[in-house]
């Protein structure tokens, strides 16, 4: 299961946790993906979409 938005292509970001002692450990930030039923290419499909795309209206939810 990929953690990528099917509309905008947003995926995981990589970086470091930094402690007060300046110790660094790598970590991953995942996008806030939601599984919704949406109309894509004229058919209703269940797709993974980030909340930014849902809020901005890039995807139309199926009723």
UniProtKB/Swiss-Prot annotation:
The UniProt entry's coiled-coil ranges are: none
Q: Give GO cellular component annotations, separated by semicolons.
A: ribonucleoprotein complex; ribosome
Give the signal sequence positions. none
Q: Does the keyword rRNA-binding apply?
A: no
Example of a GO biological process term:
translation
Q: Which Pfam families match?
A: Ribosomal_L28
What molecular function does GO assign, one term? Answer: structural constituent of ribosome
**InterPro entries, per database record:** Bacterial_rp_bL28 (IPR050096), Ribosomal_bL28 (IPR026569), Ribosomal_bL28/bL31-like_sf (IPR034704), Ribosomal_bL28_bact-type (IPR001383), Ribosomal_bL28_sf (IPR037147)
Query: What are the entry keywords?
Result: Ribonucleoprotein, Ribosomal protein
Family label: Belongs to the bacterial ribosomal protein bL28 family.
**Which NCBIfam families did the record assign?**
L28 (TIGR00009)
| PANTHER family noted in UniProt | 50S RIBOSOMAL PROTEIN L28, LARGE RIBOSOMAL SUBUNIT PROTEIN BL28A
The identity of this protein, by name, is Large ribosomal subunit protein bL28
* Lineage start: Bacteria, Pseudomonadati, Thermodesulfobacteriota, Desulfuromonadia, Geobacterales
